[in-house]
């Protein structure tokens, strides 16, 4: 069973509107600070976070105790201009766990499965066509992956550059996701008890594929 924690900045819209029309630079600065804290504190307990709309974020918290999650949220509260709250959900897939957030929680057990993907020859494509071209290419790829994830129960997120992170229900799911991806990609898949350890293993697998100049999937357990 997988566990997802959803983090919400309560009253965030009202706070932004209170700043007046000359506010966007303030909003972006605050969002950057919260995003930095999110990654710093959640990964310190072995969880794997990512922002959604900035007023909402989530974290894969399989095998992480609720008390530890609460401690992290308390740290984020200290730098947030508004209150911060969270809920947890457990499910057979990361998507189902997200959808169950706020329901009666169960125990998460088993392993975390995370993929770290990049696009082959994206640097050459950037040099030829510019960064905006590659950025849009990645966005279209994530959209394609999201469509496949609806049935598989995975969640996909853009990490920057040409990097995509996927929270998977199992190792086999990555091969099903890639059936619809038209680009040549390298993917590291990590399997571990704690989510961030799984991501580290996924990155190790991706680095191996890069060094070897290979295309496809490398699973690291």
UniProtKB/Swiss-Prot annotation:
Residues of the signal peptide: none
Record's keyword terms, sorted: GTP-binding, Hydrolase, Nucleotide-binding
Main enzyme class: hydrolase
SUPFAM superfamilies in the cross-refs: Nucleotide cyclase
GO molecular function: GTP binding; GTP cyclohydrolase IIa activity
Pfam family, any one: GCH_III
Keyword Hydrolase: yes
InterPro entries: GTP_CycHdrlase_3 (IPR007839), Nucleotide_cyclase (IPR029787), Rev_trsase/Diguanyl_cyclase (IPR043128)
Record EC number: 3.5.4.29
A single GO BP: biosynthetic process
Gene3D superfamilies: 3.30.70.270, Nucleotide cyclase
Residue ranges the record marks as coiled coil: none
Catalytic activity: GTP + 3 H2O = 2-amino-5-formylamino-6-(5-phospho-D-ribosylamino)pyrimidin-4(3H)-one + 2 phosphate + 2 H(+)
Domain of life: Archaea
Disulphide-bridged cysteine pairs: none
Keyword Zinc assigned: no
Function: Catalyzes the formation of 2-amino-5-formylamino-6-ribofuranosylamino-4(3H)-pyrimidinone ribonucleotide monophosphate and inorganic phosphate from GTP. Also has an independent pyrophosphate phosphohydrolase activity.
Membership in a protein family: Belongs to the archaeal-type GTP cyclohydrolase family.
Name of the featured protein: GTP cyclohydrolase III
